[in-house]
Every structure is written in structure tokens, then in C-alpha cells.
């Protein structure tokens, strides 16, 4: 299969992965209305083409949370990345660091914190959920700090898990799931060898380290779902803010009031996100929510965005809407599933190339010059 654009990786990943894994990455909540709107709303935003602006010297370099980056992009936390490619979190982290952008390790990664960070010269980012088991949360934070990680993404839009109907149809969940997953692996021999056999152990590394015993996919579905905490409030997070000395980013903000609450809480940044359309179907796309949130917080904290970003053009659109940087989730997951570390590296190169073309044709010579003036109208 020819890979000439970031979107080509989706079809390639669908061919390579067993259905239960592809649809786990690809799917959303309920009827997947928000999943579709995330992509569609971004694609409908018109950039303002401006010519004769002397764009011979373009720079995508930026700084986020004290880190100098080659472009305002980070890899988002994606659970079970180590099931998409052999020790997938390590491969993705290496590709990101080679490109000069951050990789974010999910709470529910296959590879534990220590394994991933030991393979990277610079600190990765770490993502944590709000869970009933505060002991696990403290253990994860302590281990992250001990490994040298200083940037925390705290996901707050999962007090309860979303209803992802595709998982039942694909074999990811349901009583017949284990049998169906084995049968699917048998007809995907490349994945079965690379990941199923050579990618062991298939633990949820961060959870099994804490529990002191191996974990499996049933634990991902069972233990994690049982530990989401619907009673959480801003006050419950104060101990984390006092414990974590580095930058703390709140992920899952869709409302300006919540964004202002994050400022009052003392967050260093927020991620405007609807969890990639995987939680509450029917909410605003991130592209529609972003402008009002960016206006509400101004320079009081750093605004990032995710959900629906598939291309370099999408990155430029999000920056013009008010984000200082973006997180790539599905886009890198598809690339990782297709060609491992090399796939993620190539994806990031494609994203950069598309950003450079978009900036040149809108007259922006630096990231700072990508503003609302780079757009023709705002999404309604």
C-alpha cells in the first residue's frame, strides 16, 4: 500500500490489525456523531490564502511547558498502544523524540513507565486518570517522578466510561470476546507473530507493577472500569497539584467555565478535547469549542487541543482557532500499527510538510503568525 498522506495510514492499519484492535482505536461512543463531527468541522474551516509574503524562511519551532519543540505537536496518550505494534509505546516514544516532539504515555499502556522512559534520552509526558484507587494514582505519580518525568496530563472527562458499541461488535468486549480475539489473530499472522508472540508480555504494565501480578485485557475492561470515580471534584485534585511539582495539564475541557476553573485550580495547561468522540456523543467538536475557551482563558494558561486532527492542515487550523499546540491520537496509532517506529516517524514528517505548505500559502513565517486572521470566518 502506498503511503503518501497521513490519512493513508488508516486503511493500512485496518488491513494489518485484528478487527477488535482496529475498531478499538477507530471507534467512538454511541452513534459516533461526535467522532465524525470532530473531523468534518475541522475540514470545513477555511484558511485565508495570502501571497507575496516572503516565506523563504519558515520556522515551526515552538516552546511548550519549558520544552523547545520542532513543531507544536505531541503524541496523545492512547491506551493499549503496545498491542498495535511490538512494545508499541517504546517505538512511538522513540519516533517522537527523534522528531523533537513529546510522547505521552497512557495510564493503561502495555509498556510500564520505567521501560519507556529508559529508552528515551529526554523526559516523556505521562497521563493519569482520576481513579477510586488513590493508592494506584500516588504510586503512578511517584514512579513517573522517579523516572524523570516532569509533565503530567490529567484526564478528567472519564468519571464513567463511555458506551462504545463497536467494541461489542468487534470482539473487544462481550462474553464471546476472548474466543473471537483468538480467531481474529489467527487470520492476521503478521500481527500474531510481531505482537502476539514477540511482543510479550501483554500486561497493562503500570497496573501490574502496582498490583504485583500480571494483568490482561480483561483487567483493562474490568479493573479500570470499576475504578473510574464519578464523585470527583476540583477539590479532590488538590493533593495532586500539591504533590506534582512539574507542569500539570488538564485534559477533557469543552466548556469555558471549566477552563476558567482550571485556571483557578492552578493548572499550567488544558487540552480542549472530547476524548476523540469516545465519551459523550453529541457534544461539541473540539474545533467548535476551542475559540470560546481560548478567549476565556487568554494567557492565563496554555491551551492545547485534540480530537479530529488527522493532517498538518488540521494542526494549522487548530492553531488558528486558538491552540498553542495539538495532540495527535488516532493519527499516530494508525501509523504505528502499520510500520511501527518508522511509521510514526514518517507520519510526523508528513505532518510537518503539510504544515509548511499551509503556512507558506497563508503567509505565516512562524507559529506565532498563525492567528484568527489566518482564517476566513469562524466555525458556527
UniProtKB/Swiss-Prot annotation:
Reaction it catalyzes: (S)-lactate + A = pyruvate + AH2
Coiled coil stretches, renumbered: none
Enzyme nomenclature, EC number: 1.1.-.-
Subcellular location: Cell inner membrane
InterPro entries, per the entry: Aldolase_TIM, Alpha-hydoxy_acid_DH_FMN, FMN-dep_DH, FMN_HAD, FMN_hydac_DH_AS, LldD
A GO CC term attached to the entry: plasma membrane
Entry superkingdom: Bacteria
This protein's name: L-lactate dehydrogenase
Origin species: Azorhizobium caulinodans (strain ATCC 43989 / DSM 5975 / JCM 20966 / LMG 6465 / NBRC 14845 / NCIMB 13405 / ORS 571)
